[in-house]
A protein has these predicted regions:
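N-terminal Rossmann NAD(P)H-binding glycine-rich loop of SDR-like oxidoreductase domains
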Residues: 4-26
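NAD(P)H-binding glycine-rich loop region in Rossmannoid oxidoreductase-like domains
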Residues: 42-83, 98
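Conserved Rossmann-fold NAD(P)-dependent oxidoreductase catalytic core, especially the SDR/UDP-sugar
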Residues: 76-121
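Catalytic helix-loop patch of NAD(P)-dependent Rossmann-fold dehydrogenases
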Residues: 102-147, 151
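Glycine/proline-rich active-site loop of Rossmann-fold NAD(P)-dependent oxidoreductases
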Residues: 127, 140-143, 152-163, 194-205, ...
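NAD(P)-dependent short-chain dehydrogenase/reductase
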Residues: 137-181, 185
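Mid/C-terminal beta-alpha module of Rossmann-like enzyme folds, strongest
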Residues: 191-250
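C-terminal amphipathic/interface module of NAD(P)-dependent oxidoreductases
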Residues: 213, 227-229, 248-279
Length: 279
């Protein structure tokens, strides 16, 4: 029986750290691809890759390049998957592809669009790549699986919405209703392993705790002490007014808007399908 071969793109990223080792431990033969191995935009032409792969797991994002470059990378990645007879492409997306104003969202919820979003940078790149893959995936001879995690924690990485101050005081970027789904890196890796091994996957998986915890309650549980919040009418209302008056760019306003994300996000279908419980 031949060894099952996996390609990891972006294997040196924070989220991918340790994933190669897990796959090897589970009996897979693993190749990795990063910037030192060649041009992402021409990955389909890279002669160093194997003749075939069972699955490709993509963590890579070209953060310092344009949206167009990132979509071009997706085109090259898809072509490489065709050439290498890949059975499934697992694309690491983000919960940032959703509008902050859906109210409730699950694995079937529509994503935001490049035309509609006020975000720039990472979030907009992820939306653009998701849009591209969704627009043509029906023509692929392989399975495309979108993985949308919350904020990934590991190695004592602090939650980005908690700012520690002296004397046991912390400030959260938001108010008591604000939410930010989170997930442990080890749980991300376990879910990806299950996705690789599954005969048939959901089109989209949500990787984050299914407990609807608010930023405020998360801060109380993890850092304790005195937790201060930022009033929405000041820290979202004033920037919104400035944006409407042409004094603030939409992309900058979207950062304030995101601080008051009240979406109730569910990973119920993911936990059921993969028989996993995000902790």
């Amino acid at each position: 029986m031949s060894t099952r071969k996996i390609l990891i793109c972006g294997a040196t990223s924070f989220v991918a750290k340790g994933f190669k080792e897990l796959l090897i431990q589970e009996g897979f033969d693993v190749d990795t691809f990063g910037r030192k191995d060649g041009n992402y935009l021409e990955i389909d032409k890279n002669p160093m890759l194997a003749d075939s792969y069972e699955a490709v797991v993509n963590f890579a994002v070209l953060k310092d390049q344009s949206i167009e470059d990132n979509v071009s990378y997706m085109k090259s990645l898809v072509e490489m998957c065709r050439q290498k007879h890949v059975k499934k492409l697992i694309y690491f997306s983000s919960i940032m592809v959703y509008s902050y104003h859906l109210g409730k969202l699950d694995e079937n919820s529509p994503i935001d669009t490049v035309a509609n979003t006020m975000m720039e940078g990472y979030g907009k790149i992820k939306i653009a790549c998701d849009e591209f893959l969704n627009s043509i995936k029906q023509s692929f001879p392989f399975e495309v699986v979108m993985v949308r995690p919350g904020y990934v924690l590991a190695d004592n990485r602090p939650a980005p919405f908690i700012k520690r101050l002296p004397c046991g005081v912390s400030v959260i970027l938001g108010n008591k209703k604000s939410r930010q789904p989170i997930v442990k890196r080890e749980d991300v890796h376990l879910a990806l392993l299950k996705i690789i091994e599954a005969d048939k996957n959901l089109p989209v998986y949500h990787l984050f705790q299914n407990n609807d915890i608010t930023k405020y309650n998360f801060a109380k549980q993890t850092v304790g002490g005195l937790i201060l919040v930022l009033p929405k009418f000041i820290f979202e209302g004033l920037p919104r007014l400035m944006m409407k008056m042409g004094m603030m760019k939409k992309a900058l306003y979207s950062r304030f808007d995101g601080m008051y994300n009240y979406n109730v996000a569910s990973s119920t279908m993911t936990e059921s399908k993969l028989n996993i419980k995000f902790k």
